[in-house]
From Swiss-Prot:
<feature type="binding site">
    <location>
        <position position="288"/>
    </location>
    <ligand>
        <name>Ca(2+) 7</name>
    </ligand>
</feature>
<comment type="function">
    <text>Calcium-binding protein involved in larval development and metamorphosis. Likely to function as calcium buffers mediating the transport of calcium from the sea water to the blastocoel where calcium is required for skeleton formation.</text>
</comment>
<feature type="binding site">
    <location>
        <position position="33"/>
    </location>
    <ligand>
        <name>Ca(2+) 1</name>
    </ligand>
</feature>
<feature type="binding site">
    <location>
        <position position="31"/>
    </location>
    <ligand>
        <name>Ca(2+) 1</name>
    </ligand>
</feature>
<feature type="binding site">
    <location>
        <position position="213"/>
    </location>
    <ligand>
        <name>Ca(2+) 6</name>
    </ligand>
</feature>
<feature type="binding site">
    <location>
        <position position="245"/>
    </location>
    <ligand>
        <name>Ca(2+) 7</name>
    </ligand>
</feature>
<feature type="binding site">
    <location>
        <position position="60"/>
    </location>
    <ligand>
        <name>Ca(2+) 2</name>
    </ligand>
</feature>
<feature type="binding site">
    <location>
        <position position="284"/>
    </location>
    <ligand>
        <name>Ca(2+) 7</name>
    </ligand>
</feature>
<feature type="binding site">
    <location>
        <position position="145"/>
    </location>
    <ligand>
        <name>Ca(2+) 4</name>
    </ligand>
</feature>
<feature type="domain" description="EF-hand 3">
    <location>
        <begin position="85"/>
        <end position="120"/>
    </location>
</feature>
<feature type="binding site">
    <location>
        <position position="256"/>
    </location>
    <ligand>
        <name>Ca(2+) 7</name>
    </ligand>
</feature>
<feature type="binding site">
    <location>
        <position position="40"/>
    </location>
    <ligand>
        <name>Ca(2+) 1</name>
    </ligand>
</feature>
<feature type="binding site">
    <location>
        <position position="251"/>
    </location>
    <ligand>
        <name>Ca(2+) 7</name>
    </ligand>
</feature>
<feature type="domain" description="EF-hand 5">
    <location>
        <begin position="165"/>
        <end position="200"/>
    </location>
</feature>
<dbReference type="Pfam" id="PF13499">
    <property type="entry name" value="EF-hand_7"/>
</dbReference>
<protein>
    <recommendedName>
        <fullName>Calcium-binding protein LPS1-alpha</fullName>
    </recommendedName>
</protein>
<feature type="binding site">
    <location>
        <position position="215"/>
    </location>
    <ligand>
        <name>Ca(2+) 6</name>
    </ligand>
</feature>
Length: 321
């Protein structure tokens, strides 16, 4: 956590911090992973997903899309991440985006500003993905490593499975049928799982497994099954791999990963920037963001997909995806 956050905590009594820590563990972090997700807030507070996302965006200092304990302190103390900054620092952020210095940020300036920061952090994102996926330590990602790790890190699917609560529901269902707890389903377990609502023949189950089994081990891991629910086939993922593997040598280099991330995320960034302009320019509805709008709306509620690209430059945080 940043020095700013440390200073904020330093002004609080130790017993208050301990009490908040217990509250965080007992009532908020329901899956005990050390963070509070949008899905957990929705369930706990009976909020809409949009409300939960907005709350997390206002507190998400390290821009990972979750609420860490230190960020939870901000929430419980009625503060927000922008209060960790001085007015001069926020003004500097605004001026960095306002390229022509006319006191307002145009859609084009926002596009260019976000992309400038984006190009600076994409190398770090690529290196992090390579490190996470590279099981054999050769500095590259082969097809099997891509299947095992990256298909759940990159936004390849377009279906409802990007909803965290949806994923959690199916993960719990999946685990009920994973009798030995090894994280995968055998043919028999898969048959039992899939036949809850509809009866399938052995041949149909075998065909389904062949479509879902990304690493060809004859079993179905949860990530494989979940990608199938998201409308992503094995052939589609292979096409994604080959599109990133520019030299067609069967493995992805760090340089190729930079290219792949840029291509995959470009459309997402376009969508998020357009959404930011629409949601931020609410006072005079002129299609631009003035300084008041920047402070009161844009900076506070910036979605974490853009947050993770822009604000870490000022926070000194690593980008997580």
């Amino acid at each position: 956590m940043s020095d700013r956050m440390a200073k904020f905590k330093a002004g609080m009594p130790k017993d208050a911090i301990e009490a908040l820590k217990q509250e965080f563990k007992d009532n908020y972090d329901t899956n005990k992973d050390g963070t509070v997700s949008c899905a957990e807030l929705v369930k706990l507070m009976n909020w809409t997903e949009e409300m939960a996302q907005n709350i997390i965006a206002r507190l998400d200092v390290n821009s990972d899309g979750h609420m860490q304990f230190d960020e939870f302190i901000l929430y419980m103390e009625g503060s927000t991440k922008e209060r960790l900054y001085s007015s001069d620092e926020i003004k500097q952020m605004f001026d960095d985006l306002d390229k022509d210095g006319n006191g307002r940020i145009s859609p084009d300036e926002l596009n260019k500003g976000v992309r400038e920061i984006y190009t600076k952090v994409v190398d770090g994102m690529a290196n992090k993905l390579i490190q996470e996926a590279d099981k054999d330590g050769d500095g590259h990602v082969n097809m099997e490593e891509f299947f095992d790790t990256l298909v759940v890190k990159l936004p390849i699917g377009m279906g409802p499975c990007k909803d965290e609560e949806y994923r959690e529901y199916y993960k719990n269902e999946f685990e009920k049928f994973d009798k030995n707890g090894d994280g995968s389903l055998t043919t028999a377990e898969m048959s039992e799982f899939m036949s809850k609502s509809t009866k399938y023949s052995d041949k149909e189950i075998e065909y389904l497994i062949s479509r879902v089994d990304l690493n060809d081990d004859g079993r179905v891991q949860f990530n494989e099954f979940f990608m199938h629910l998201d409308g992503v086939s094995k052939d589609h993922i292979k096409q994604q791999f080959m599109a990133i593997d520019k030299d067609k040598n069967g493995k992805i280099s760090p340089e190729e990963m930079v290219f792949g991330i840029t291509k995959i995320y470009r459309q997402m960034v376009d969508f998020e920037v357009a959404k930011l302009i629409k949601e931020s320019s609410f006072e005079d509805d002129d299609g631009y963001i003035n300084f008041n709008e920047f402070v009161n709306r844009f900076f506070s509620n910036c979605p974490y997909k853009i947050n993770s690209l822009y604000w870490p430059i000022y926070l000194g945080c690593a980008v997580s995806i």
